[in-house]
């Protein structure tokens, strides 16, 4: 029962992590306008994401534009896109594999095979969490580096958006769920070596009987 509870908890965390990754990759809130200087009121706020950028006017009107050309995008943005898509597919595959080998399903009857399937699902989810973590940390490092770079104009400086924080949380949920699934795998049973069987052997008396017969001859 404890193993089943850990599996359900791990799969629940993995589902939440997958949904968080999907929302983080879809929202254009990876980079937002940095409020630098004494003036708080600005004419517009810029949001930048993996797939589009949005401009929010001071009146509340928002205009979004999807990136048209893939080749015109920076290489770091292309890599972040690819890693996020691969992470989403891997996490979905890990969830399907976990459902197949879960204790509460009857897709596989063998208990040993179920344990190996759940362990595989946990490893896949751990890998998906790492793939989510790479573009999020990469983008955050680039934003912080440009923010403190005196050569970058203040109008071009950005701050960390909400999608980055959501991406960190989603990666943590995926890795935590994958770790719980790996912990549900039972340890291999080691057979204890059997000791030598103790028995009693009756000594042969043929030699003694032969000597006795020769003595009488």
UniProtKB/Swiss-Prot annotation:
Q: Which gene encodes it?
A: CLDN9
* Cytoplasmic-side segments: 1-7, 103-116, 181-217
Looking at the keywords, is Membrane present?
yes
The cellular location(s) given in this protein's UniProt record come to: Cell junction, Tight junction; Cell membrane
Q: Any one Gene Ontology biological process term?
A: cell adhesion
Q: Which InterPro entries does the record associate with it? A: Claudin, Claudin9, Claudin_CS, PMP22/EMP/MP20/Claudin
The domain of life is Eukaryota
Which tissues is this chain's protein expressed in?
Expressed in the liver, in peripheral blood mononuclear cells and hepatocarcinoma cell lines.
The listed outcome for residue 43 to S is: No effect on HCV infection susceptibility in cell culture
Q: Which family does it belong to?
A: Belongs to the claudin family.
Return the Pfam families for the record: PMP22_Claudin
Q: Give the protein name, as stated in the record.
A: Claudin-9
The residue ranges for the Extracellular side of the membrane come to 29-81, 138-159
Q: What does the UniProt entry list as the effect of changing residue 53 to N? A: No effect on HCV infection susceptibility in cell culture
Query: Where does this protein have coiled-coil stretches?
Result: none
Disulfide-bonded cysteines: none
This protein's GO CC annotations: bicellular tight junction; cell junction; intracellular membrane-bounded organelle; plasma membrane
Topological category with respect to the lipid bilayer: Multi-pass membrane protein
Please provide the record's keywords in A-Z order: Cell junction, Cell membrane, Deafness, Host cell receptor for virus entry, Host-virus interaction, Membrane, Non-syndromic deafness, Receptor, Tight junction, Transmembrane, Transmembrane helix
Q: Which disease is it linked to?
A: Deafness, autosomal recessive, 116: A form of non-syndromic deafness characterized by slowly progressive, moderate to profound sensorineural hearing loss. Sensorineural deafness results from damage to the neural receptors of the inner ear, the nerve pathways to the brain, or the area of the brain that receives sound information.
Per the UniProt entry, the effect of residue 45 to N is: Abolishes HCV infection susceptibility in cell culture
Name one molecular function that GO assigns to this entry.
identical protein binding
What this protein is reported to do is described as: Plays a major role in tight junction-specific obliteration of the intercellular space, through calcium-independent cell-adhesion activity. (Microbial infection) Acts as a receptor for hepatitis C virus (HCV) entry into hepatic cells.
**Where does the chain cross the membrane?**
8-28, 82-102, 117-137, 160-180
Q: Where is this region: Disordered?
A: 194-217
UniProt source species: Homo sapiens
Q: How does it assemble?
A: Interacts with CLDN1, CD81 and OCLN.
């Amino acid at each position: 029962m404890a193993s089943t509870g850990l599996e359900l908890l791990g799969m629940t965390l993995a589902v939440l992590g997958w949904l968080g990754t999907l929302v983080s990759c879809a929202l254009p809130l990876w980079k937002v306008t940095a409020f630098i200087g004494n003036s708080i009121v600005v004419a517009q706020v810029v949001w930048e994401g993996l797939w589009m950028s949005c401009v929010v006017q001071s009146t509340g009107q928002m205009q979004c534009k999807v990136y048209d050309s893939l080749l015109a995008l920076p290489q770091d943005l292309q890599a972040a896109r690819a890693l996020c898509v691969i992470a989403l597919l891997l996490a979905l595959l890990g969830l399907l594999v976990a459902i197949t080998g879960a204790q509460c399903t009857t897709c596989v009857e063998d208990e040993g095979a179920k344990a190996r399937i759940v362990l595989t699902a946990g490893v896949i989810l751990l890998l998906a969490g790492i793939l989510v973590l790479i573009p999020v940390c990469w983008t955050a490092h680039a934003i912080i580096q440009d923010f403190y770079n005196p050569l970058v104009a203040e109008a071009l400086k950005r701050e960390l958006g909400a999608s980055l924080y959501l991406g960190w949380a989603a990666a943590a949920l995926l890795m935590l769920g994958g770790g719980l699934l790996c912990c549900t795998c039972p340890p291999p049973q080691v057979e204890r070596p059997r000791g030598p069987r103790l028995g009693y052997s009756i000594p042969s008396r043929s030699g003694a009987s032969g000597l006795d017969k020769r003595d009488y001859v």
